[in-house]
Each structure stands twice: as C-alpha cells, then as structure tokens.
Amino acid sequence: AFVERMNARAAELGMNDTVFKNCNGLDEDGHITSAYDVAVMSRALMQHEKIFDYTLIWIDYVRDGQTQLVNTNKLVRTYDGILGLKTGTTSAAGSCISAAAERNGMRLIAVVLGAENTKDRFSAASSLLDYGFANWKLTTPELPELPELPVTGGMVSAVSLACEAPRGVLTASGGAEIGIKLFLPENVPAPVEPGDVLGTAEVALNGDTVQSLKITAKTEAPAITFSSALQYFLACFFAAEAA
C-alpha cells in the first residue's frame, strides 16, 4: 500500500521514468528511476526545510550512545554550502548521490548515478555543483512602479494596486534579458475590494514568459448608490454654503 502511494506521488511530481517496487531502495526487477527524476524528488523534499536538520548531521549516536552513526555523504564536511541530501549504493545501481548546495541564495541539485565507487560519486557531484555555481546565477527582477487604475461608477476615481513579489530567475552568468510587462485594463467597474485580481505582470526571460504574477487591488472602491450619491451631493452643497 505504501509503495502504491510512492508511485502515485511520483506521478504527481512528473517523475515519468520512475517505478517503485519497494520502499527500501534495494535492487528489484522493475524498480527504476532516472537522474532527472531523482532531482525532481529532491527538489520536492527540499521544500520542507526541516529535512536539513537531518541531512547535515555528520555524526550521531543511538542506543544510549553505544552505537555511532556517521553520515555517508562526505560532502557534508567538505563542500561549501552543502545542504545534503542522500547517498545510495547497490550492486545494480552503483554508487549514487543526490547532492544539494546553496550559495548566494541559489540552490542547486546534482545527481550522480552508477559511479564505480564513492570517491567518483563525490567528485562528480562536486564538479556538477561547481559548474552550476560558476555559470549560473539567480536574478530577482525588479517590479516597475504600479499606476493607479481608474474606476467607473465608484465613490473614488481610482484604486491603488499591489503585485505578487517576483521569484528569482535562473540566468546564465554571462547575462540575460529579463523584463516585466504589466497587463491591466483601461479601467474597472465598481465595486472593487482589496485583494480583487485586476491584472497580471508577466516576467520574461529572453522573450519567453517564465512567471505570471497577480496584480490586485490595494484599496477599495465602493459602488455609487442613490443614497451614497445623495449623501455626497448634500455634503458638497453644505460645504459650498459654509464657504
């Protein structure tokens, strides 16, 4: 039953080359995966920050301190910015690792499968991470100033806007063109409530849209009613009389 849930979750994550036959990772006919799928699984795991409390432990003790456990991921002690994650070795799969690291706010995952020995897997994983950090960077695009959006039929003429914060965009270190384009109507009808979605901001990398951010109302615009219009007229009338 648990293995069925593993396969269902793998399908949800888009791990199209993975079939789990057991939950221990040992060799079994039909028990397969790919480096890409392991990276996808690792990325999902890393969304739970608590996992690093365990993957970064080097030595621990169990059974009242009588048994010592040493992390099989040697990169925990040697690689700058390492976060984990998991090693594995079987006769069919060889020496494997999913290694994750973070530098300057950018997290990378390197997956090595089928290495001949542990030394080779750590060397290959380190080289892959080094390549990633040397050639890629995380750039957070800057939102343009948001205009006020005109309102028709409202007690106010316009509403202020807010936008979701853009996420970092992975770009080559050599430079890339990142732009943000706002898509807003000319006006919106009242009533407008704070939080109402009124448009989008499209983040583009070299012309291709990579993020779509919601633009929402920051302030409200109640609709004009007979009573509100009368109240407004009387307020203006008496203000004029007082002047």
PLM feature segments, named:
Residues 1-18:
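Short, charged, amphipathic alpha-helices and their helix-cap/turn boundaries
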Residues 15-19, 27-243:
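Domain-terminus/edge residues, biased toward the C-terminal soluble/receptor-binding domains
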